[in-house]
Amino acid sequence: MLPLCSERELNELLARKEEEWRVLQAHRAQLQEAALQAAQNRLEETQGKLQRLQEDFVYNLQVLEERDRELERYDVEFTQARQREEAQQAEASELKIEVAKLKQDLTREARRVGELQHQHQLMLQEHRLELERVHSDKNSELAHQREQNERLEWELERKLKELDGELALQRQELLLEFESKMQRREHEFQLRADDMSNVVLTHELKIKLLNKELQALRDAGARAAESLQKAEAEHVELERKLQERARELQDLEAVKDARIKGLEKKLYSAQLAKKKAEETFRRKHEELDRQAREKDTVLAAVKRAHAEELQTLDAKVLELQFLCETLEGQLRRAECTRAEDAKEKNALTDKFREDAAALKAAWDAQITQMSKETVSKDFQIHTLQEEEMKLKAQVARFQQDIDRYKQQLSLAVERGQSLEREQVQLGLDWQRRCDDIERDQIQKSETLIEGLTKARDQVAAKLQETEKALRQQETLLKAVSLERDQAMETLRTHGLLPGQEAQVPPQQHEGEIRADSPSTEIQRLQEQNAGLRNAVSQMRREMEMLSGHLPPAQPEECSNADPDPKAGGDSTPPDYVLTLEAEMQNLKHKLKALEEQLQSTEEPVKTSVATADPHHGVHSSAAAADAALADQTSTALALRKLGDRVHLLNLLVTQLKRKLRQKPRELVPVQHEVPSEVDQVHLEVLELQKQVAELRKHLKVTPQGEPSSREQLQRQGVADRYPMGMEDQTESPTFPQEGAQPPQTIYVTHLQRKLKDAARKILSLRLEREQLLEMGNRLRAEQGHAKGKPTPCPGPPTSEPQDPQEVPERSLDRGPPLGQLQPYSTTQDPRHTKRRCASEYAGKSQPHSAQVGSKTNTPRGHKAEMASRPAQLSQKQHRIPTETWKPVYQKENRTPKLPQAHEVPEESDHRTHRSSSLASSSLQDIWRLLELGSSPSGVPSQDNSVAECPAPSRPSCFQKVNRSPVPIQKAFAVKGLKMEAQPKATPPRPSKSHPAKPTNCQQQRPSRIRNYNLKD
């Protein structure tokens, strides 16, 4: 019985212990939930404190703005002081006037003495002895007075000079000291502002991380609550027995909460006391701010208070981190205990005693943790009190530096005004020098180019005369050969010739004659061609030497201030990038049109060579094939060059877009890079337009051959060009039939229509280029505003906004001549003037460069219609006067080196070298095009990788080129994105006949006193 009773008692004891253990587990879970909720409440309280601190920071910023207004008032007082100083100077001038009056009195006294002497001389006979004595006395007195007056004048002048020298020395010393101190102070304040901004950003990042961690802790707490609810459902019976223990724990919690509330009340009272102290401090300083010197002290005090508040924020953030770490430790402990509970459920009953001991140890650890938290709060309150004492000491120390700041600011204003005046004067002087040098260089280049064009025209005239002489010799040779053949036939019929000569057939003899005559003609033509090549190469060498000896423009000295580093944060591309893209699309369409012309010229030549009789007209077919091959090689080379240039422009535009879409950098390198890249793109566009015009002219010159082959080429060219996609025609042309219009008139009318379209598009390009220049001027004006310098404002427009369809007609008919330059204003940007001259030069020479006139002055240009601009189809068809094509044709081959050589070198040296290399390469390309146009047989290229065909294998090479027209078109195709060009309204511009000179508009001078606490 004893063992049974002992077993029952043990079972009951085990059940009681098990219930007690479960109740303790539930109570422990409740305690952990309460601790988590208390930590969340503390976190909310800290967030409220942080919000209040932010509001205090905003209030401090408002106080700083009030201080800035007071500084402006100080500026007004400083101007009044300057006025008083000017009044003192006026008083000094009045004193000088009084000195002059004294001198006049002295002269009057001298005159009176002379009159007395004259009177004494009249009475000399009666009173000679007395008069001599009186005269000697008077003379001695006058001499003594004169010496005294001269001594006084000399002393006064010496004192004035000494005072002037001392004033100058004092001014220089004060200026030097002020500049050094201002630079030092500015550097220190900038470093402090950067540190403060970095600290604020780090605090914001830390707060975000803490918010994320708290959210994760809340989720974990929710999951723990769910698990605890399940445990409570299982252990409801054990809770009944442990209610007394729970009441004791609740009492302990109440005591702990009461103590926490007491500490919070103390903290709140300390904060209220701090606020009251701050209010009293602020009121005292507001009263002291009524005086001039003590108002600036509050500014420094607020700055230091702001720094200390940031330090307190750091301390509070560290406290929050510490609390989060404690919460994480508690959660980890809860998870460990939960795992231990799962293991202990499956363990033996003997381990319950050890679990009870573990619960007691955990309870003791929690109590120690709570005591540590209270101690840390007491320590925080003590640190806050110490920081308040430090703040008061710092405010007392910073009151001494305010007077020096005021003096330094006044001296800085004077120094800045003097520097601005000197800078404006230097800019005007350098601009005048650059304008004079540019005019001289442009005049020299124009005279040189006119001489070269005249020499080229003379060489062309000589070549035409030699061709006429060759034709006459050919006709004479043919007539002589026919007479000789007739004589030989008559001799053979009569039997007068010997037997060997009679056996020779007449056809073979005619073949020998025809074989001999072309060889001599070819030799003569080759000799003439070699002479022409030598002349052209000599002219090219002279041009390159002259372009190499052009002097660079004078450097412009200007001091750029530090602009706003966060200006221009918009990632959308500006208008001038869109205009560059529109010009790129125009050039791509030009390339496509030239490729279509090349393909249309290749196919007729191929058919004519295939259908020609091999035994009849050998010389004419070979000459036509050689000329066609030369034209194909020259056009292929030029098209490849244009493709490379278009690819380069694509790269430049993408680089500009990438730079604008990236994170905005400092404004100074952007100011230096963007105008230079825009200028480079402009130069490339001008060179491409010139080369397109020359290629168009070169393609329209048909090779001289038999009339039948030429008519066939024209017919097939018309048949091939019409289906190539001219979008502006409503009716598709057909092949000429019997009784229809001849193909030559159809081709001429078609070319006239295309020339009108090309002229209209070139004028639209010119308007877009002018808009781009205006945008660049606006950008420079904004840069000048950001630097705080007086910028030139454009003059009022003299003409009202006009219809964009009427602007091209006026620019064609009323534009100034090419050699005439517009007047330069002294306040205009030299880079703008250079680019404007270049754009006007290109805009006036480009519409006429596409015309190659015959004796009837028929236009023969060609340009494909753009598919992406249907809005331009309804514009007016502008008529280009045909009387003015000759002088423009003489001036269309100008090199782009001339406007580029006078560009002011505001950029680095490598940019100037790059621009000169681009100009020299464009010059070499133009000379190669001249050589290609003058030579009847193709000239081997040095830059491109086109294989050269030898003279005997020309027909085979020609066939190979004709067999594969599709790969050539693919090789010259330019890949790009289609963009719909948006129509832009042309801004109102002043008329070119009366250009309005811009004047300097005196803008409102911004405040020179910088607030170092406010971020830029």
UniProtKB/Swiss-Prot annotation:
| UniProt key word GTP-binding | no
According to the record, the residues making up region (Centrosomal targeting domain) are 1-503
Q: Which GO terms describe its biological process?
A: centriole replication; cilium assembly; G2/M transition of mitotic cell cycle; microtubule nucleation; positive regulation of mitotic cell cycle
Where is the segment annotated Microtubule binding domain? 604-1016
**Where on the tree of life does the source sit, at the highest rank?**
Eukaryota
Location of this chain's protein in the cell: Cytoplasm, Cytoskeleton, Microtubule organizing center, Centrosome; Cytoplasm, Cytoskeleton, Microtubule organizing center, Centrosome, Centriolar satellite; Cytoplasm, Cytoskeleton, Microtubule organizing center, Centrosome, Centriole; Cytoplasm, Cytoskeleton, Spindle
Q: Where is the composition biased (Polar residues)?
A: 846-859, 934-945
Q: Which InterPro entries match?
A: CCDC57
Example GO CC term: the record gives: centriole
Record carries keyword Ligase: no
Detail the disulphide connectivity of this chain as listed in its UniProt entry: none
In this chain, the stretch annotated as Disordered covers 500-519, 549-573, 781-921, 933-1016
Stretches of the chain forming a coiled coil according to its record = 14-607, 676-700, 748-775
Its keywords, alphabetically, are:
Coiled coil, Cytoplasm, Cytoskeleton
What the protein does comes down to: Pleiotropic regulator of centriole duplication, mitosis, and ciliogenesis. Critical interface between centrosome and microtubule-mediated cellular processes. Centriole duplication protein required for recruitment of CEP63, CEP152, and PLK4 to the centrosome. Independent of its centrosomal targeting, localizes to and interacts with microtubules and regulates microtubule nucleation, stability, and mitotic progression.
Instruction: Please describe the quaternary structure of this protein.
Output: Interacts with CEP63; the interaction is required for their location to proximal end of centrioles. Interacts with microtubules.
Report the protein name in the record: Coiled-coil domain-containing protein 57
Question: Organism source for this protein?
Answer: Mus musculus
- Gene of this entry: Ccdc57
